[in-house]
């Protein structure tokens, strides 16, 4: 079920996008477009700085005792590169390291796509998705594991507060809202 949910979220986000991908003829066209955008972010993009901060563990998925043991302060950071396409969508490659729920290092690297709607001067709301690999001690002893998740954001100038949801596959696993920030000097100059 977990893998089906991740694949469904990824496909929905791609098909709902306001990019040329929405009218692509095949999955191969979509994949080729995303590879080209990733390559563009890597070589032509601007640097991003990420700061991680908070992980909310859903009360319905964890006992009170378990939640008291878990780390909510997911402190860490990372770097990335982003490029904006002709439609105003942002394509990003990133890597982050932060303390996981068990106070151990978690490594994450991936691709993110975001689209934005203006709300006021310099204020935008965004929705998108991320496809990434993560490695942590309690899941495969740091063996890289793939995941796809939705992202929501509020961007003001060059600063962006972002949130993603990590779905659960069992009791005491997943069901986390993860908050982090991104600063990109490209915006709000």
Question: Model segments located where?
Answer:
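Outer-membrane beta-barrel "beta-signal"
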Residues: 55-57, 174-189
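Solvent-exposed loop/turn segments connecting transmembrane beta-strands
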Residues: 69-71, 87, 97-108, 135-145, ...
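Hydrophobic, lipid-facing positions within transmembrane beta-strands of outer-membrane proteins
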Residues: 47, 73-77, 91, 105-111, ...
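Short glycine/proline- and aromatic-enriched beta-strand/turn motifs that initiate or cap beta-hairpins
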Residues: 23-81
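Transmembrane beta-strands of outer-membrane beta-barrel proteins
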Residues: 45-51, 91-93, 123-129, 161-163, ...
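Short loop/turn motifs that connect adjacent beta-strands in outer-membrane beta-barrel proteins
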Residues: 36-46, 84-90, 116-126, 187-189
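Residues on the lipid-exposed face of transmembrane beta-strands in outer-membrane beta-barrel proteins
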Residues: 51, 77-81, 95, 109-115, ...
């Amino acid at each position: 079920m977990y893998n089906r949910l991740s694949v469904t979220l990824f496909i929905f986000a791609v098909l709902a996008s306001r990019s040329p991908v929405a009218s692509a003829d095949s999955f191969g066209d979509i994949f080729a477009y995303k590879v080209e955008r990733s390559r563009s972010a890597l070589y032509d993009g601007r640097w991003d700085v990420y700061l991680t901060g908070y992980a909310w563990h859903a009360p319905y998925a964890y006992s009170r005792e378990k939640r008291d043991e878990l780390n909510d302060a997911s402190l860490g950071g990372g770097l990335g590169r982003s490029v904006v396409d002709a439609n105003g969508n942002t394509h990003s490659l990133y890597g982050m390291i932060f303390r996981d729920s068990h106070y151990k290092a978690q490594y994450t690297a991936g691709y993110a796509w975001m689209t934005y709607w203006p709300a006021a001067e310099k204020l935008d709301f965004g929705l998108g998705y991320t496809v990434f690999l993560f490695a942590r001690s309690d899941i495969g002893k740091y063996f890289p594991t793939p995941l796809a998740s939705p992202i929501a954001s509020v961007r003001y100038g060059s600063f962006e507060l972002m949130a993603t949801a990590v779905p659960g596959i069992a009791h005491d696993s997943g069901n986390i809202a993860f908050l982090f920030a991104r600063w990109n000097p490209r915006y709000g100059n």
